């Protein structure tokens, strides 16, 4: 008999626990959702989206409204909407116990600003993806201009390299190699401010200091780019202190194994 009472006790306990969880969950779903706790992370200093801007976009899309009940907060739809924003690299939205919920966002990190021949402006991020310009934010990054043809929106360097039909915008991968090197090298990052693409495909680097220009030439591989910048750094560290910043008008690293200076 004692064993029967024990079994009945635990059955009733389990049923009671299930009922408590059920009604607590039902009550929670009918509760008013708090404003989301939004966390935005970006490598570097160029953040193209703030917490308040993201919240405004969610409100505009009616994915979140003031006094919205918890059960109407659809985190999957919210994630799907946010990941489509071209500034966003990763997103995770989730509910907590009670009526609080979170949105964690990682933004793309722009490393170059590109102006095409028609004066359309794009950004290129550190993974080789293009981003449209922002009306609210400007990134302090390397600027590219010159004979740059149209760049399709949301193109990536990887897509261009692996797709023969995208050869018309092939220079995007060259732009990525130069900007990726410059942003990671403290000396070049402090020195180079602009890059101009000539009609013949040569890149011209324009320093922030001095009046000279740097004829860089092509940038068709990571090895070529690294070799040219290494030669340039040797010149700036060892030659420039003796020659002075104003002695030469043009520094040429276009040709393999050479540094040529012209007055």
Model-predicted segments: where are they?
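Charged, solvent-exposed interaction patches on well-folded alpha/beta domains
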Residues: 1-42, 51-53, 58-84, 89-263
């Amino acid at each position: 008999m004692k064993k029967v009472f024990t079994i009945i006790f635990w059955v009733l306990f389990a049923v009671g626990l299930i009922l408590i969880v059920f009604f607590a969950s039902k009550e929670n779903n009918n509760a008013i959702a708090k404003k989301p706790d939004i966390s935005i992370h970006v490598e570097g200093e160029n953040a193209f989206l703030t917490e308040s801007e993201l919240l405004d976009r969610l409100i505009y899309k009616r994915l979140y409204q003031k006094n919205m009940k918890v059960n109407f907060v659809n985190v999957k739809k919210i994630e799907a909407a946010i990941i489509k924003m071209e500034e966003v690299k990763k997103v995770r939205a989730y509910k907590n116990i009670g009526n609080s919920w979170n949105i964690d966002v990682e933004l793309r990190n722009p490393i170059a600003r590109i102006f095409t021949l028609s004066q359309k402006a794009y950004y290129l991020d550190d993974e080789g993806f293009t981003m449209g310009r922002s009306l609210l934010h400007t990134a302090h990054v390397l600027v590219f201009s010159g004979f740059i043809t149209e760049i399709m929106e949301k193109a990536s360097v990887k897509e261009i390299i692996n797709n023969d039909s995208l050869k018309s915008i092939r220079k995007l991968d060259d732009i990525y190699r130069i900007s990726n090197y410059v942003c990671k090298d403290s000396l070049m990052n402090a020195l180079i401010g602009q890059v101009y693409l000539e009609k013949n495909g040569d890149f011209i680097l324009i320093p922030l200091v001095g009046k000279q220009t740097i004829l860089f030439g092509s940038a068709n591989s990571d090895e070529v780019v690294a070799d040219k910048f290494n030669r340039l750094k040797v010149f700036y560290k060892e030659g420039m202190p003796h020659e002075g910043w104003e002695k030469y008008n043009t520094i040429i690293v276009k040709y393999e194994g050479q540094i040529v200076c012209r007055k």
